[in-house]
Protein backbone atom coordinates (compact mmCIF):
# COMPACT_ATOMS: atom_id res chain seq x y z
CA UNK A 1 0.00 0.00 0.00
CA UNK A 2 2.74 2.42 0.94
CA UNK A 3 4.51 1.92 -2.39
CA UNK A 4 1.28 2.58 -4.27
CA UNK A 5 0.46 5.73 -2.28
CA UNK A 6 3.98 7.14 -2.43
CA UNK A 7 4.37 6.45 -6.15
CA UNK A 8 1.06 8.17 -6.88
CA UNK A 9 2.12 11.19 -4.82
CA UNK A 10 5.44 11.35 -6.66
CA UNK A 11 3.49 11.86 -9.88
CA UNK A 12 0.96 14.27 -8.42
CA UNK A 13 1.51 15.92 -5.05
CA UNK A 14 -2.01 17.34 -5.09
CA UNK A 15 -3.59 13.93 -4.59
CA UNK A 16 -5.18 13.16 -1.23
CA UNK A 17 -3.28 10.60 0.85
CA UNK A 18 -6.39 9.10 2.43
CA UNK A 19 -8.15 8.80 -0.94
CA UNK A 20 -5.16 6.89 -2.27
CA UNK A 21 -5.21 4.55 0.72
CA UNK A 22 -8.89 3.86 0.12
CA UNK A 23 -8.28 3.31 -3.59
CA UNK A 24 -5.56 0.77 -2.89
CA UNK A 25 -7.59 -1.08 -0.27
CA UNK A 26 -10.68 -1.19 -2.51
CA UNK A 27 -8.76 -2.72 -5.40
CA UNK A 28 -6.56 -5.04 -3.34
CA UNK A 29 -9.21 -6.46 -0.99
CA UNK A 30 -12.33 -6.17 -3.20
CA UNK A 31 -15.49 -6.97 -1.18
CA UNK A 32 -13.51 -7.04 2.07
CA UNK A 33 -12.25 -3.49 1.60
CA UNK A 34 -14.52 -1.81 4.16
CA UNK A 35 -13.28 -4.18 6.86
CA UNK A 36 -9.64 -3.73 5.88
CA UNK A 37 -10.02 0.02 5.77
CA UNK A 38 -11.46 -0.13 9.29
CA UNK A 39 -8.50 -2.35 10.29
CA UNK A 40 -6.12 0.25 8.85
CA UNK A 41 -7.92 3.06 10.72
CA UNK A 42 -7.75 1.22 14.04
CA UNK A 43 -4.00 0.74 13.68
CA UNK A 44 -3.43 4.33 12.56
CA UNK A 45 -5.62 5.73 15.33
CA UNK A 46 -3.96 3.56 17.98
CA UNK A 47 -0.49 4.80 17.04
CA UNK A 48 -1.75 8.38 16.92
CA UNK A 49 -3.32 8.05 20.37
CA UNK A 50 -0.14 6.58 21.85
CA UNK A 51 2.06 9.29 20.39
CA UNK A 52 -0.19 12.33 20.88
CA UNK A 53 -2.07 11.46 24.06
CA UNK A 54 0.21 9.10 25.96
CA UNK A 55 3.38 10.77 24.63
CA UNK A 56 4.90 7.44 23.67
CA UNK A 57 7.15 7.25 20.68
CA UNK A 58 8.08 4.12 18.83
CA UNK A 59 11.58 4.11 17.45
CA UNK A 60 13.20 1.45 15.37
CA UNK A 61 13.94 -0.76 18.40
CA UNK A 62 10.63 -0.30 20.21
CA UNK A 63 8.55 -3.27 21.27
CA UNK A 64 5.57 -2.64 19.03
CA UNK A 65 3.78 -5.77 20.22
CA UNK A 66 3.31 -4.51 23.79
CA UNK A 67 -0.01 -4.28 25.60
CA UNK A 68 0.54 -0.52 25.91
CA UNK A 69 -0.10 -0.28 22.21
CA UNK A 70 -2.33 -3.30 21.65
CA UNK A 71 -4.72 -3.66 24.56
CA UNK A 72 -7.31 -6.45 24.56
CA UNK A 73 -10.12 -4.28 23.14
CA UNK A 74 -7.95 -3.12 20.24
CA UNK A 75 -6.72 -6.65 19.55
CA UNK A 76 -10.32 -7.88 19.52
CA UNK A 77 -11.36 -5.10 17.16
CA UNK A 78 -8.54 -5.94 14.74
CA UNK A 79 -9.37 -9.64 14.90
CA UNK A 80 -13.06 -8.98 14.26
CA UNK A 81 -12.26 -6.79 11.25
CA UNK A 82 -10.32 -9.62 9.68
CA UNK A 83 -12.89 -12.31 10.50
CA UNK A 84 -15.60 -10.11 8.96
CA UNK A 85 -13.36 -9.54 5.95
CA UNK A 86 -12.97 -13.29 5.46
CA UNK A 87 -16.73 -13.76 5.75
CA UNK A 88 -17.37 -11.01 3.20
CA UNK A 89 -15.48 -12.85 0.45
CA UNK A 90 -17.12 -16.21 1.03
CA UNK A 91 -19.23 -15.85 -2.13
CA UNK A 92 -16.08 -16.23 -4.22
CA UNK A 93 -15.39 -19.69 -2.81
CA UNK A 94 -17.60 -21.25 -5.49
CA UNK A 95 -17.97 -18.47 -8.07
CA UNK A 96 -14.27 -17.62 -8.42
CA UNK A 97 -12.05 -20.00 -6.39
CA UNK A 98 -8.82 -18.44 -7.65
CA UNK A 99 -9.85 -14.95 -6.50
CA UNK A 100 -11.15 -16.41 -3.24
CA UNK A 101 -7.79 -18.01 -2.45
CA UNK A 102 -5.90 -14.86 -3.38
CA UNK A 103 -8.11 -12.70 -1.13
CA UNK A 104 -7.99 -15.18 1.75
CA UNK A 105 -4.20 -15.06 1.82
CA UNK A 106 -4.12 -11.29 1.48
CA UNK A 107 -6.36 -11.03 4.54
CA UNK A 108 -4.59 -13.79 6.44
CA UNK A 109 -1.28 -12.03 5.92
CA UNK A 110 -2.71 -9.33 8.17
CA UNK A 111 -4.00 -11.97 10.58
CA UNK A 112 -0.41 -13.00 11.35
CA UNK A 113 0.18 -9.78 13.29
CA UNK A 114 -3.10 -10.05 15.14
CA UNK A 115 -2.44 -13.66 16.13
CA UNK A 116 1.00 -12.69 17.35
CA UNK A 117 -0.37 -9.85 19.50
CA UNK A 118 -3.10 -12.08 20.94
CA UNK A 119 -0.78 -15.03 21.63
CA UNK A 120 1.94 -12.93 23.25
CA UNK A 121 -0.24 -10.45 25.17
CA UNK A 122 -3.71 -11.86 25.70
CA UNK A 123 -3.43 -15.65 25.75
CA UNK A 124 -4.99 -15.85 29.21
CA UNK A 125 -8.35 -14.80 27.78
CA UNK A 126 -8.59 -17.86 25.53
CA UNK A 127 -9.19 -21.55 26.12
CA UNK A 128 -6.22 -23.82 25.55
CA UNK A 129 -7.86 -25.27 22.43
CA UNK A 130 -8.57 -21.82 20.95
CA UNK A 131 -5.02 -20.71 21.72
CA UNK A 132 -3.57 -23.88 20.22
CA UNK A 133 -5.64 -23.30 17.08
CA UNK A 134 -4.30 -19.72 16.78
CA UNK A 135 -0.72 -20.86 17.31
CA UNK A 136 -1.09 -23.61 14.70
CA UNK A 137 -2.58 -21.22 12.16
CA UNK A 138 0.14 -18.67 12.97
CA UNK A 139 2.84 -21.24 12.17
CA UNK A 140 1.03 -22.37 9.00
CA UNK A 141 0.75 -18.79 7.77
CA UNK A 142 4.32 -17.95 8.75
CA UNK A 143 5.47 -20.98 6.78
CA UNK A 144 3.29 -20.03 3.79
CA UNK A 145 4.65 -16.47 3.75
CA UNK A 146 8.20 -17.70 4.53
CA UNK A 147 8.44 -15.73 7.75
CA UNK A 148 10.93 -17.26 10.15
CA UNK A 149 11.65 -14.51 12.69
CA UNK A 150 9.74 -11.87 14.59
CA UNK A 151 12.56 -9.34 14.51
CA UNK A 152 15.64 -8.92 12.42
CA UNK A 153 18.43 -10.96 13.94
CA UNK A 154 15.96 -12.69 16.24
CA UNK A 155 15.91 -16.40 16.91
CA UNK A 156 12.36 -17.19 15.89
CA UNK A 157 8.96 -17.12 17.54
CA UNK A 158 8.57 -16.92 21.34
CA UNK A 159 5.90 -19.62 21.53
What are these regions (language model features)?
Residues 5-159:
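Catalytic domains of carbohydrate-active enzymes that cleave complex glycans
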Residues 2:
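Catalytic cores of enzyme domains
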Amino acid sequence: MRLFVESQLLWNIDLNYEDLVKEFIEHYYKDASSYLYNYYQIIRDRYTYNVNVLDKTYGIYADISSTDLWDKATSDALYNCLINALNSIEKYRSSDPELFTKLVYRIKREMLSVYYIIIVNHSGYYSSSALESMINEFYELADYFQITKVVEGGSGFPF
